[in-house]
């Protein structure tokens, strides 16, 4: 779906006041590092370490009531995303906090109500998408989550003018639960996916046309992802792409027939336990076979298969990016299974032939392979992100322009940007001004701003967002209009989120679509944490450090704020300090730091956290006898390593859905960091928890849902078996039939247990809680 309606989902963010602290190591600008956890995860991509410490001063000298767990689940404390989208060069649609959906026209600055909030209540709909011709809306209801991005839902087609309603179902099927449904790019084009086959409607009144017939439940997927492609490769549900004029549809066929099956038991609600099976490849096992097809939507059903480059086998490759470049041209990125070589192809969809435009190789792994290149109109030149070596800090990601000479054979390559910072996204190329628009971290590793650079003169570069809302926003997402005249800026922190619309020629002229007024009001009388930022010198590296400290929100000053996360309750009400250290494995600090964990997870990353903790314990306001650790998934793995290692400084720790053995995790992730088990079995062994020998009386709290499809309960079962053999005490809290992301009620219960655990641990012997990586749930 293009947009989602109703109240925004609970988002992991917290409120802070920003305060810069002088660096311990080399001078850097860390302003704005305290952005939301969601943004931190995007920025760091792998590691986001937090240490929770107890302050020696337990007396409150601040006003305002502390944050509570109940606050976290109130709508007024949650972020609202207006989900603004361009529907033409001069028009956007967006949704306000009250649920009403509007269209804004840049030509006359008028805003028109398209869809009332009462419509969602009438049809019990929670998702929506508006047709390109603005006549119809697709309403999704009875939504049932499958994995992180995928869901089943039933759909209605609602006429915005006559208010007539019709169900969207495959032929001869009623009350269907569809795997996907959305509009095309022209008029009322519509596709939906049922039982892993793609259906097409040329318009609302036309009959459905089944485009594929090979779909098999849980085995062959057409136009949507299986578990591996959804969670580890494409990172979304859809696996199809419209041509610009809507005349063709490219789609993946993912065949899991040889992929081993994982069983997820369901214990409650029946006399005997039931369960579901799904295909889940682990390291060294068969991966899905994948094929790319293009079908013509003129009624002929002509389908062309796009073949991979020579040397790539369908089961030993990933298709990580597909993008239409012109009406008949498609760019595709093919990555080998080891993820250390990629080929960017430009394909003629009428003939099925491709030419190689660029090849990348690495002796570790290749990062950012989902990033889409930007082509010129004639496809002779394109812009992509490539590593550029820096003399002292390793390589950083920068914009490279690659073009063919007049002969069509010789290729030139030159970088438009350089420095010890990363380009994160290339947004657009404006040929009328020879300008490339992009997002980068030039202002600091935890900042992201909008920039423009000239293709003719790379020294002609400017930051378009750096001077906007300085006290509130240092991390932006951006979406440019198709004519590169306007931009939607989504401020993600460190202050309250807001969405604004700007003219690129005059960025200070803007309209605000959403400024989180409800959240601002909710936080007005709450005791909101503040942050301090430092750098920590560890060996030859200078790592980022963030401390979240108890402090009241001064209502007479304009403090940057972040949204509420559960640690904020600890900080606000229990005088506990949260610390995060971005050690080896984190992004935007050069490839030397990023690749430092290659084949060494649980070793050098744990060393970085331990060394950082030793420096933290020297601070006068931290009680060194009260230190704990928290983490989920990879963070649960790392927190367990830190807690149970020899001479650990941690008193207690929590591991939520911990990865305990990388051989048990998904193939794409495990093989990326460790390689193939036949060659690297020893690397897998030293990075598992089987080597733990600690018998100290630390307190370990393990939390896991039994129906977790991402990190299976098998991991916690192996950990419990190991701890029992070592006579190490532990507490286990399971959530029957719950997945990797808990339901709202279970999440609230879990967080209450987490809070009680830390309070008990810290009260027993003057104790800190360290939080390792958390995911963007």
Protein language model regions, located:
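Beta-propeller folds
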Residues: 1-486, 492-497, 768, 773-777
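Short beta-to-alpha linker loops that shape the active-site pocket of alpha/beta-hydrolase fold enzymes
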Residues: 143, 161, 405, 551, ...
């Amino acid at each position: 779906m293009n947009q989602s309606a109703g109240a925004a989902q609970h988002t992991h963010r917290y409120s802070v006041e920003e305060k810069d602290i002088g660096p311990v190591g080399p001078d850097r600008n860390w302003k704005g590092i305290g952005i939301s956890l969601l943004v931190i995860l995007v920025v760091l991509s792998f590691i986001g370490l937090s240490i929770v410490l107890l302050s020696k001063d337990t007396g409150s000298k601040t006003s305002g009531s502390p944050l509570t767990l109940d606050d976290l689940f109130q709508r007024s404390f949650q972020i609202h995303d207006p989900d603004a989208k361009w529907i033409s060069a001069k028009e956007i649609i967006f949704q306000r906090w009250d649920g009403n959906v509007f269209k804004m026209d840049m030509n006359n600055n008028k805003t028109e109500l398209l869809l009332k909030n009462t419509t969602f209540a009438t049809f019990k709909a929670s998702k929506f998408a508006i047709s390109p011709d603005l006549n119809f809306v697709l309403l999704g209801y009875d939504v049932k989550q499958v994995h992180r991005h995928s869901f089943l839902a039933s759909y209605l087609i609602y006429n915005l003018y006559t208010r007539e309603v019709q169900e969207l179902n495959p032929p001869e099927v009623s009350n269907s639960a569809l795997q996907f449904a959305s509009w095309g790019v022209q008029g009322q084009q519509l596709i939906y996916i049922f039982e892993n086959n793609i259906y097409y409607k040329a318009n609302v009144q036309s009959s459905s046309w089944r485009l594929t017939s090979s779909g098999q439940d849980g085995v062959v997927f057409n136009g949507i992802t299986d578990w591996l492609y959804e969670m580890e490769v494409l990172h979304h549900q859809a696996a199809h792409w419209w041509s610009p004029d809507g005349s063709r549809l490219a789609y993946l066929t993912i065949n899991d027939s040889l992929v081993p099956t994982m069983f997820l038991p369901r214990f409650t609600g029946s006399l005997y336990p039931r369960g579901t099976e799904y295909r889940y490849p682990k390291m060294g096992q068969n991966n899905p076979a994948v094929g790319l097809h293009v079908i013509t939507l003129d009624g002929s059903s002509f389908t062309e298969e796009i073949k991979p480059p020579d040397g790539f086998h369908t089961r030993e490759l990933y298709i990580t990016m597909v993008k239409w470049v012109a009406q008949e041209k498609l760019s595709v990125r093919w990555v080998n299974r080891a993820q250390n070589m990629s080929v960017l192809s430009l394909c003629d969809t009428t003939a099925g032939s491709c030419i190689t435009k660029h090849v990348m190789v690495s002796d570790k792994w290749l990062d950012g392979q989902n990033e889409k290149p930007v082509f010129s109109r004639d496809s002779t030149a394109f812009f992509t992100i490539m590593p550029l070596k820096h003399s002292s800090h390793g390589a950083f990601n920068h914009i490279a322009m690659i073009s063919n000479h007049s002969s069509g054979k010789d290729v030139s390559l030159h970088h438009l940007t350089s420095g010890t910072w990363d380009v994160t996204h290339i947004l657009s190329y404006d040929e009328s001004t020879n300008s490339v628009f992009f997002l980068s971290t030039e202002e600091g590793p935890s900042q992201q701003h909008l920039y423009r650079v000239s293709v003719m003169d790379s020294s002609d570069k400017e930051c378009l967002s750096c001077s906007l809302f300085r006290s509130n926003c240092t991390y932006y997402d951006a979406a440019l209009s198709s004519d590169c005249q306007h931009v939607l800026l989504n401020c993600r922190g460190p202050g309250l989120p807001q969405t604004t619309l700007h003219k690129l020629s005059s960025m200070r002229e803007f309209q605000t679509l959403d400024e989180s007024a409800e959240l601002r009001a909710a936080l007005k009388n709450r005791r909101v944490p503040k942050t301090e930022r430092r750098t920590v010198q560890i060996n030859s590296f200078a790592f980022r450090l963030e401390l979240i400290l108890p402090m009241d929100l001064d209502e007479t000053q304009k403090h940057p704020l972040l949204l509420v996360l559960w640690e904020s309750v600890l900080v606000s009400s229990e005088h506990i300090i949260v610390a995060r250290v971005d050690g080896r494995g984190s992004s935007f600090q050069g490839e030397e730091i990023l690749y430092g964990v290659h084949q060494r997870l649980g070793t050098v990353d744990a060393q970085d956290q331990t060394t950082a903790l030793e420096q933290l314990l020297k601070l006068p306001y931290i009680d060194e006898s009260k230190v704990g650790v928290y983490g989920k998934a990879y963070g649960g793995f790392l927190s367990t390593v830190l807690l149970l290692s020899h001479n650990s400084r941690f008193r207690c720790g929590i591991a939520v859905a911990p990865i305990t053995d990388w051989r048990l995790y998904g193939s794409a992730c495990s093989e990326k960091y460790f390689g193939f088990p036949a060659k690297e079995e020893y690397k897998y062994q030293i990075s598992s928890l089987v080597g733990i020998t600690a018998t100290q009386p630390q307190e370990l709290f393990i939390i896991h849902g039994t129906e977790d499809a991402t990190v299976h309960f098998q991991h916690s079962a192996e950990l419990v078996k190991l701890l029992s053999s070592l006579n190490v005490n532990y507490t286990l809290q399971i959530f029957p039939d719950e997945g990797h992301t808990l339901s709202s009620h279970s999440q609230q219960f879990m967080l209450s247990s987490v809070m009680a655990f830390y309070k008990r641990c810290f009260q027993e012997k003057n104790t800190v809680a360290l939080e390792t990586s958390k995911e963007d749930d």
